[in-house]
Amino acid sequence: VHEPVRGYGQACLRGLSALSAADIVVFLDGDYSDFPEEMPTLYEPIETGAADLVIGSRVLGQREKGALLPQARFGNWLSTCLIRWLFDVSFTDLGPFRAIDYTALKQLKMCDRDFGWTVEMQVKAARLRLRCMEGPVRYRKRIGTSKISGTVSGSMRAGYKILWTIFRHMG
Protein backbone atom coordinates (compact mmCIF):
# COMPACT_ATOMS: atom_id res chain seq x y z
CA VAL A 1 0.00 0.00 0.00
CA HIS A 2 1.43 3.38 -0.97
CA GLU A 3 0.43 6.67 0.66
CA PRO A 4 1.83 9.82 -0.99
CA VAL A 5 0.59 12.17 1.76
CA ARG A 6 2.96 12.46 4.73
CA GLY A 7 1.91 11.63 8.25
CA TYR A 8 1.94 8.59 10.50
CA GLY A 9 -1.82 8.57 10.99
CA GLN A 10 -2.36 9.11 7.28
CA ALA A 11 -0.28 6.02 6.51
CA CYS A 12 -2.24 4.00 9.08
CA LEU A 13 -5.57 5.19 7.69
CA ARG A 14 -4.46 4.25 4.16
CA GLY A 15 -3.42 0.79 5.30
CA LEU A 16 -6.75 0.29 7.05
CA SER A 17 -8.64 1.38 3.94
CA ALA A 18 -6.95 -1.48 2.06
CA LEU A 19 -8.25 -4.11 4.51
CA SER A 20 -11.21 -6.14 3.38
CA ALA A 21 -11.61 -8.10 6.60
CA ALA A 22 -9.53 -8.74 9.70
CA ASP A 23 -9.81 -10.11 13.21
CA ILE A 24 -6.77 -8.32 14.65
CA VAL A 25 -4.73 -5.44 13.26
CA VAL A 26 -1.08 -4.98 14.20
CA PHE A 27 0.67 -1.63 13.73
CA LEU A 28 4.45 -1.19 13.75
CA ASP A 29 6.96 1.29 12.41
CA GLY A 30 8.78 0.55 9.18
CA ASP A 31 12.05 2.14 10.33
CA TYR A 32 13.72 -1.01 11.74
CA SER A 33 13.10 0.06 15.36
CA ASP A 34 10.51 -2.64 16.14
CA PHE A 35 10.99 -6.42 16.13
CA PRO A 36 8.18 -7.95 14.01
CA GLU A 37 8.87 -11.40 15.46
CA GLU A 38 7.44 -10.10 18.75
CA MET A 39 3.95 -9.73 17.27
CA PRO A 40 2.60 -12.76 19.21
CA THR A 41 3.24 -10.86 22.46
CA LEU A 42 0.72 -8.32 21.23
CA TYR A 43 -1.94 -10.32 19.40
CA GLU A 44 -2.17 -13.43 21.59
CA PRO A 45 -3.98 -11.65 24.48
CA ILE A 46 -6.56 -10.48 21.93
CA GLU A 47 -6.90 -13.97 20.43
CA THR A 48 -7.55 -15.44 23.87
CA GLY A 49 -10.12 -12.76 24.75
CA ALA A 50 -8.00 -11.16 27.49
CA ALA A 51 -7.70 -7.76 25.78
CA ASP A 52 -9.05 -5.55 23.01
CA LEU A 53 -5.91 -3.41 22.67
CA VAL A 54 -2.33 -4.38 23.52
CA ILE A 55 0.40 -1.74 23.43
CA GLY A 56 3.98 -2.84 22.91
CA SER A 57 5.78 -1.08 25.73
CA ARG A 58 9.31 0.02 24.97
CA VAL A 59 9.52 1.13 28.60
CA LEU A 60 8.83 -2.38 29.93
CA GLY A 61 11.04 -4.04 27.31
CA GLN A 62 14.73 -3.85 26.49
CA ARG A 63 15.95 -0.80 24.59
CA GLU A 64 19.10 -0.33 22.61
CA LYS A 65 21.13 2.55 24.07
CA GLY A 66 20.02 5.79 22.43
CA ALA A 67 16.91 4.27 20.82
CA LEU A 68 14.40 6.08 23.03
CA LEU A 69 15.60 9.67 23.31
CA PRO A 70 15.23 11.65 26.57
CA GLN A 71 12.51 13.88 25.12
CA ALA A 72 10.52 10.80 24.07
CA ARG A 73 10.94 9.22 27.52
CA PHE A 74 9.75 12.41 29.21
CA GLY A 75 6.85 12.81 26.78
CA ASN A 76 5.79 9.21 27.36
CA TRP A 77 5.94 9.66 31.11
CA LEU A 78 3.94 12.91 31.09
CA SER A 79 1.34 11.64 28.62
CA THR A 80 0.79 8.31 30.33
CA CYS A 81 0.49 10.03 33.73
CA LEU A 82 -2.20 12.33 32.29
CA ILE A 83 -4.06 9.40 30.73
CA ARG A 84 -3.95 7.53 34.05
CA TRP A 85 -5.18 10.59 35.94
CA LEU A 86 -7.89 11.63 33.47
CA PHE A 87 -9.12 8.25 32.20
CA ASP A 88 -8.08 5.81 34.96
CA VAL A 89 -6.21 3.54 32.55
CA SER A 90 -2.55 2.75 33.12
CA PHE A 91 -0.05 2.78 30.25
CA THR A 92 3.75 3.16 30.31
CA ASP A 93 4.19 3.99 26.63
CA LEU A 94 2.59 5.54 23.54
CA GLY A 95 4.69 3.30 21.31
CA PRO A 96 3.60 2.53 17.76
CA PHE A 97 3.96 -1.28 17.99
CA ARG A 98 0.47 -2.42 18.99
CA ALA A 99 -2.36 -4.81 18.22
CA ILE A 100 -6.08 -4.19 18.38
CA ASP A 101 -9.23 -6.19 17.78
CA TYR A 102 -10.61 -5.02 14.42
CA THR A 103 -14.16 -4.55 15.74
CA ALA A 104 -12.81 -2.44 18.61
CA LEU A 105 -10.68 -0.43 16.17
CA LYS A 106 -13.74 0.45 14.10
CA GLN A 107 -15.49 1.69 17.27
CA LEU A 108 -12.66 4.17 17.83
CA LYS A 109 -13.34 6.02 14.55
CA MET A 110 -9.69 6.98 14.21
CA CYS A 111 -9.06 10.24 12.37
CA ASP A 112 -5.69 11.75 13.37
CA ARG A 113 -3.49 12.04 10.29
CA ASP A 114 -0.09 12.57 11.91
CA PHE A 115 1.76 11.82 15.14
CA GLY A 116 -1.32 12.08 17.38
CA TRP A 117 -2.51 8.70 16.05
CA THR A 118 -1.13 6.51 18.85
CA VAL A 119 -2.37 8.67 21.72
CA GLU A 120 -5.74 9.12 20.00
CA MET A 121 -6.14 5.34 19.90
CA GLN A 122 -5.21 4.93 23.56
CA VAL A 123 -7.40 7.77 24.83
CA LYS A 124 -10.42 6.68 22.79
CA ALA A 125 -9.94 3.08 23.95
CA ALA A 126 -9.78 4.30 27.55
CA ARG A 127 -12.94 6.39 27.15
CA LEU A 128 -14.81 3.43 25.66
CA ARG A 129 -13.51 1.23 28.50
CA LEU A 130 -11.93 -1.25 26.13
CA ARG A 131 -9.76 -3.89 27.78
CA CYS A 132 -6.27 -2.41 27.42
CA MET A 133 -2.97 -3.95 28.41
CA GLU A 134 0.71 -3.75 27.56
CA GLY A 135 3.39 -6.24 26.69
CA PRO A 136 7.15 -5.64 26.83
CA VAL A 137 8.82 -5.23 23.44
CA ARG A 138 12.41 -4.62 22.44
CA TYR A 139 13.30 -1.39 20.71
CA ARG A 140 16.35 -0.45 18.66
CA LYS A 141 17.66 2.68 17.00
CA ARG A 142 15.71 3.54 13.91
CA ILE A 143 17.18 3.85 10.45
CA GLY A 144 17.39 7.53 9.52
CA THR A 145 16.52 10.60 11.58
CA SER A 146 13.10 11.04 13.11
CA LYS A 147 11.15 14.08 11.93
CA ILE A 148 9.53 14.13 15.36
CA SER A 149 11.99 13.28 18.14
CA GLY A 150 15.07 13.99 16.03
CA THR A 151 14.74 17.78 16.35
CA VAL A 152 13.83 20.21 19.13
CA SER A 153 11.05 21.77 17.04
CA GLY A 154 9.69 18.35 16.08
CA SER A 155 9.68 17.25 19.71
CA MET A 156 7.87 20.42 20.76
CA ARG A 157 5.27 20.05 18.00
CA ALA A 158 4.73 16.41 18.94
CA GLY A 159 4.42 17.25 22.63
CA TYR A 160 1.85 19.94 21.93
CA LYS A 161 -0.13 17.66 19.61
CA ILE A 162 -0.11 14.76 22.08
CA LEU A 163 -1.26 16.94 24.99
CA TRP A 164 -3.91 18.60 22.79
CA THR A 165 -5.17 15.16 21.73
CA ILE A 166 -5.42 13.96 25.33
CA PHE A 167 -7.34 17.03 26.50
CA ARG A 168 -9.56 17.13 23.38
CA HIS A 169 -10.92 13.68 24.19
CA MET A 170 -11.59 14.38 27.87
CA GLY A 171 -15.25 15.32 27.63
Language-model segments: which ranges?
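Catalytic donor-sugar/metal-binding loop of nucleotide-sugar-dependent glycosyltransferases
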Residues: 89, 113, 123-140
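Acidic metal-phosphate-binding loop of nucleotide-sugar-dependent transferases
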Residues: 32-34
